[in-house]
Amino acid sequence: MLYHPSVAPDLEWLADDRGLGIDDVITLHSEATYFAYATGFAPGFCYLGTLPEALQTPRLDTPRATVPAGAVAIADAQTAVYPCESPGGWRLIGACPEPLFNLSNAPPSLLTVGATVRFEPISETDFRALGGVMP
């Protein structure tokens, strides 16, 4: 996962709001192991928890009209990866370069209820090499 302000418009805000450095946010988010509690909202959208307390923050007051596929986001005590472009009110802190939902795959979603997930920080070079697109 790429943690970089160019793909994560709320990363700097979150660090400032929580009194943390960006590296602290990355460490806290990437060192936790998350449990997939439920799917919903959009096909392949998996609610992961529990977010470290230091990162827990409310949703945006006004949702964004468009959140790109692969956006890694947090809201309250949960984190998630948007599987497709959609509206969304979660705070964006990173991006996943690989698609998580594809109807051609069986099963179509890489994340399923009951799975455990960890986010591995990667460089911008690796993000691009894995198919990630920078804005």
Can you say where each PLM-predicted feature lies in the sequence?
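Glycine-rich active-site loops that engage anionic ligands at enzyme catalytic sites
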Residues: 1-135
